[in-house]
Design a protein with these regions (language model features):
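Hydrophobic beta-strand positions that form the internal "hydrophobic ladder"
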Residues: 37, 75-78, 121-124, 163-166, ...
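Multi-bladed beta-propeller domains
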Residues: 1-23, 49-67, 82, 93-113, ...
Length: 288
């Protein structure tokens, strides 16, 4: 017996949903002038006014997960990661949502982590689960490999103020984080910290003269009265290095010295005598 049950299609109907209760924690970025905030909620990109105006859903892509949104420093673009193709790819779109999104990467083969804009708004750097650190030029869409780790994913990457250097963290076989600097000009990386201590979170000073990082190198143990053991509970401190030989450390040792005054009134003249003066002295000597 053939049986059919008619329904009113309630499950497939559109409905209004309060997306504010589905904002993804930690996935937000403030516009460079502070007037709008961008977030991801229910897999879509949104921008929210700081005080007055409308909330915009920029993507409206059911079935697609968009995340890791970042506002370009010049305020023009939003960069984000989307699985619209079935794999994680990086896109940019204008912050007003008027223009169509632009796909920057292709052939995605693994999970991508957060993207970070260069200060000149021309490049994006990110790391992935295949232990790669890469950046892409948003104009040419050229992807460049910065570093290939062997044991663990890279820590967060940060740009220098002139967009010519990238500071990043990598763990090697000892699983101890180390801070490196990558030059976009030479395509080479330089180890900044040593192999003895855990270090991470390299960040440039606004003037580009210093690199700050967090390192576990403060060994001040606390002795337990019950466990008969030592606890190293507060090893992490903030440190910095100067990035040029000509840069003086603001914490360089100082040594006050006494300024010795020189008495110039009794100083003997060393000015050569003229020929006339020499003849006069010669005549005085002959007369005596």
């Amino acid at each position: 017996v053939s049986i059919s049950i008619a329904d009113d299609g309630a499950i497939g109907r559109n409905e209004l949903v309060d997306a504010s209760t589905f904002i993804e924690g930690g996935d937000y970025d403030l516009g460079p002038d502070g007037n709008r905030l961008t977030v991801t909620a229910r897999g879509d990109l949104w921008t929210i006014p700081a005080k007055d105006g409308i909330t915009r859903n920029l993507s409206k892509t059911p079935g697609v997960h968009e995340r890791s949104v970042a506002w370009s420093p010049d305020g023009k673009y939003l960069a984000y990661i989307s699985d619209a193709t079935g794999e994680d790819e990086i896109y940019i779109r204008t912050q007003d949502g008027v223009e169509a999104p632009v796909q920057l990467t292709v052939n995605g083969d693994t999970y991508k982590y957060y993207v970070t804009w260069s200060p000149d708004s021309k490049k994006l750097v990110w790391s992935d689960k295949k232990l790669r650190l890469q950046y892409v030029d948003i104009t040419s869409k050229q992807v460049t490999l910065v570093d290939q780790a062997k044991t663990w994913e890279h820590g967060g990457a940060n740009w220098s103020p002139d967009s010519k250097w990238i500071a990043y963290t990598r763990s090697d076989d000892d699983f101890r984080g180390k801070v490196f600097l990558y030059s976009l000009d030479s395509k080479k990386s330089t180890l900044v910290t040593d192999n003895w201590y855990e270090a991470s979170g390299g960040v440039f000073s606004p003037d580009g003269k210093y690199l700050f990082f967090v390192s576990d190198r403060d060994f001040s143990p606390t002795y337990s009265r019950t466990e008969w053991n030592h606890s190293y509970a507060d090893m992490s401190k903030v440190y910095f290095v100067t990035l040029a030989k000509s840069t003086t450390s603001p914490l360089a040792p100082k040594n006050d010295e006494v300024l010795v005054k020189v008495d110039t009134s009794a100083a003997v003249s060393t000015t050569p005598a003229s020929a006339k003066e020499k003849n006069a002295k010669k005549k005085e000597a002959e007369a005596s």
